[in-house]
């Protein structure tokens, strides 16, 4: 398992470190709003501690992302497959245009959640909001 310290790392460098990791299990600690974590990821388990920025898991294609904290806007935008679990709240447009996969939110969501979700052939998107 690889552990990455986010801290004050700029989001582009943080995502390069995540993509470059050889392990399939990655833990990202001290996240303070870095964007696009796990975008387009396939066959990985990414654990996030902190507040994930915009676009968490956009275009996700089979990975699992678990956030111990909150996430900002556009979680799972255009997601194809995989799973996102947020043990907190998320901002606006969660699950926007998702085509498959599952999103579970423990807390509340902002506006326009699940807008343009669509099922196609064997892909059936699922979103559960606990707030």
What is each residue range found by the language model?
Residues 1-131:
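Long, distal/terminal scaffolding or interaction modules
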